[in-house]
Amino acid sequence: GYLGAPAVVAPGAPLAARAYAAPAYAAPLARYAAPVARAYAAPVARAYAPAVAAAPAAVEYDPHPQYSFAYNVQDAHTGDSKTQHESRDGDVVQGSYSLAEPDGSIRVVDYTADPVNGFNAVVHKEAGAHPAAAPVAVAAPVAHAPVAVAAPVRAYAAPLARAAYAAPIARASYGPALAYGGAYH
């Protein structure tokens, strides 16, 4: 028969009656306790001395600042040639710097700065002490022979076989009987 069909049972003898004891409940235990009295200590009063601000360190101020510096670079290996010197007397700064240009000339910049006229620079060029380096000849680009590339080979394989699985096993279901034998109401 069909596995999902309900089972019909017709026993010949009546089913045995079952007896159950009446439920018994214990009386609830009523336990009430008085709340616990808690004592807290008063907060501790603390006295702090007021913070003392440190006196600012005295900043040294020079009402008439003065300085002077200079440097000179002459590198025969790289051809680097530059100089600078600068001096300050109060609010007036005077200086000059020079450097070698790629064309062999020397650029000289004389500058001054003061509170009345601001920053002023005068630029002039001097003929070079060494000639400019000759331009380097650039080699023509190398033409490479074309590379032959084979066309890709297209090959197709049969599809992979898939694993086969059996159908699920039918499960028996259980439920109450449709009828019981006997005329009991």
UniProtKB/Swiss-Prot annotation:
Chitin-binding type R&R domain residues: 64-134
Superkingdom of source: Eukaryota
InterPro entries, A to Z: CHIT_BIND_RR_consensus (IPR031311), Insect_cuticle (IPR000618), Insect_Cuticle_Struc_Prot (IPR051217)
Sequence repeats: 21-24, 33-36, 41-44, 54-57, 133-136, 139-142, 150-153
KW Repeat (keyword) present: yes
PROSITE patterns in UniProt: CHIT_BIND_RR_1 (PS00233), CHIT_BIND_RR_2 (PS51155)
Gene Ontology annotations for the cellular component aspect, listed alphabetically: extracellular matrix; extracellular space
Any one GO molecular-function label of the UniProt entry: structural constituent of cuticle
Protein keywords: Cuticle, Repeat
Pfam families, A to Z: Chitin_bind_4
Function: Component of the cuticle of migratory locust which contains more than 100 different structural proteins.
Record text about domains: The tetrapeptide (A-A-P-[AV]) repeats found throughout the protein are also present in many proteins constituting the protective envelope of other species.
Protein name per UniProt: Cuticle protein 18.6, isoform A
Species of origin: Locusta migratoria (Migratory locust)
